[in-house]
């Protein structure tokens, strides 16, 4: 296994093997980060959550809950859940939802959702502030693969 010796640049796509990515996710220096892996590149977002992002996040979640309170839908909402396809990809969208028959597909007690075992969410929401280009680019393509 390769050993990452240099610090990983924040909010930048960096060439890395899957093993280096896993090593970074286990590094205590990055424990507060959001991790992404796509096409042999990793990205760690260590940015603090801004007031605007927190407001938008809670507003969107509130809207989802309000909609669900007035409609008969079976939905499981995941807040900042990690989705992993081993040796290929990982992402942590701000909000994700499993709808209908998929609502109960992820059992309680599941940590990182293994996309080799479970389907991807039916709805993924990434709240963009300064990261809009990434959210529409590599981050956005993750769930489509």
Place the predicted regions along the sequence by residue.
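Gly/Pro/Ser/Thr-rich low-complexity, intrinsically disordered segments predominantly at protein N-termini
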Residues: 1-144
């Amino acid at each position: 296994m390769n050993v990452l010796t240099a610090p990983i640049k924040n909010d930048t796509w960096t060439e890395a093997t899957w093993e280096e990515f896993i090593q970074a996710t286990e590094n205590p220096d990055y424990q507060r980060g959001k991790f992404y892996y796509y096409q042999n590149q990793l990205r760690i977002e260590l940015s603090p959550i801004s007031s605007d992002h927190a407001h938008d996040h809670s507003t969107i979640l509130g809207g989802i809950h309000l909609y669900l309170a007035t409609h008969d839908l079976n939905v499981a909402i995941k807040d900042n859940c990690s989705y992993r396809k081993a040796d290929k990809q990982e992402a942590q969208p701000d909000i994700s939802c499993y709808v209908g028959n998929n609502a109960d597909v992820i059992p309680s007690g599941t940590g990182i959702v293994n996309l080799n075992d479970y389907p991807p969410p039916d709805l993924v929401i990434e709240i963009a502030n300064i990261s809009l280009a990434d959210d529409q680019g590599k981050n956005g393509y993750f769930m489509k693969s």
